[in-house]
Amino acid sequence: MFEELGVRLAQPEEVHEIMAEALRACSENGFANASQIKVLEQVWCGLNLDNGLIGVIGEPGKLEGGILLRITDVWYSDDKVLEERAIFIPPEYRGVKGGRARRLCEFAKQAAKAMEMPLLIGVLSNHRTEAKVRLY
C-alpha cells in the first residue's frame, strides 16, 4: 500500500535503530526531557502494530527516516484518531534530495485514510520550527 512512497512498516528487530533516532528527535526538539522508558513504550507499540505503527524509509541498519503514529483519542472525545508522535530524519539525510519528510507525512495521511480515522499531525519544536512549518 505504501510502496509507491518508498515507505515500509518498521519491524520489531529494528527497535535499537528506531530508538536511537527517536531519542535524537526528542533531544533536538528540546521541549521536555525524554524518558527512555516512555519513548520505548511508544516505539515498541508502533513496531508491534499495537494501537500504532512506524513507517520507515531505508533498509534495516540504514534508516533514512521514520514516523511514529499512535491510535489515541483527543482530550474532549472518545473518537479515535491517528496521532503523529514524531518524524525523524537522521542529519545526514536532511536537505538531501528525496523528500523523505514529505513522503513520511504522505504515509501518515494514507494510513489515516486506510484506517478511516482523522490524522492529528503538526509542529512541536523550538529548533528548526520554520522548516517544519513549511513541511506541513
Region locations from a protein language model:
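Alpha-helical elements of Rossmann-like donor-binding domains used by nucleotide-donor carbohydrate transfer enzymes
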Residues: E17-E21, Q42, R103, F107, ...
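A short helix-loop-beta-strand connector motif used in the catalytic cores of GNAT acetyltransferases and
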Residues: V43-V56
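Conserved beta-strand-loop-alpha-helix junction that forms the acyl-donor binding cleft
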Residues: L104, A108, L120-V133
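Short amphipathic alpha-helix that is part of the acyltransferase structural core
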Residues: M1-I37
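Conserved acetyl-CoA binding element of GNAT-fold acetyltransferases
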Residues: D78-E92
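Conserved beta-strand in the GNAT
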Residues: V56, K62-T72
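Conserved acetyl-CoA-binding loop-helix of GNAT-fold acetyltransferases
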Residues: I89, G95-Q110
